[in-house]
A protein has these predicted regions:
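Conserved short histidine dyad/triad with adjacent acidic residue
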Residues: 47-54, 66-82, 103, 116
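Ligand-binding loop in jelly-roll beta-barrel domains
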Residues: 1-10, 116-142
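Conserved hydrophobic/aromatic positions in well-ordered beta-strands
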Residues: 66-68, 88, 133
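A generic structural signal for short beta-strands and their flanking turns/coil linkers
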Residues: 61-66, 86, 93, 128
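A short beta-strand-loop-beta hairpin characteristic of the jelly-roll/cupin
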Residues: 75, 81-108, 118
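A generic fold-level signal
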Residues: 45, 58-62, 82, 106, ...
């Protein structure tokens, strides 16, 4: 236990695990971001990084939680989409996020839920880093109703 008088934050994400026949469940783990390396995103001029808490190729996991960081001036320079819905919780800083047809100002403490195939982009104007938790379902087919 900590003897510090500083306030801390804890994010607990709960979901029902989606089993797949023939794939064993991953073991539970707790990890601090200091244990993960920053992976620079391609063609970002060292302004856009992602910390991955699990190996992206490990299909036992049915969700990922990453930390995305933009340095001032960092951008997602194109409207991208994803096949899965995903959540974003802003940890630090301010930016404008392109969601579908709108640019929305976001800052620390904000939460975004993005639908599948929602066009998105980001511009982090500064003055400091812009960081967020990125949650997304992975490695499972979307069920048809």
């Amino acid at each position: 236990w900590s003897n510090s008088s500083e306030i801390t934050n804890f994010h607990w994400i709960r979901k029902v695990y989606k089993d797949v026949k023939g794939i064993e469940r991953p073991t539970a783990f707790v990890k601090n971001e200091t244990e993960c390396e920053d992976v620079e995103m391609p063609n970002s001029n060292s302004t856009w990084f992602t910390k991955r808490f699990v190996d992206a190729d490990d299909v036992r996991h049915d969700m990922h939680v990453n930390i995305v960081t933009f340095q001032p001036g960092g951008v997602i320079p194109f409207a991208e989409t994803h096949v899965m819905e995903h959540g974003i919780f802003i940890l630090e800083g301010k930016a404008v996020y392109h969601l579908n047809q709108d640019w929305v100002e976001v800052e620390a403490g904000d939460f975004l839920w993005l639908r599948a195939f929602c066009p998105q982009a980001c511009y982090a104007g500064g003055p400091g880093p812009f960081r967020y938790l990125l949650y997304k379902d992975v490695n499972r087919h979307v069920p048809f109703l």
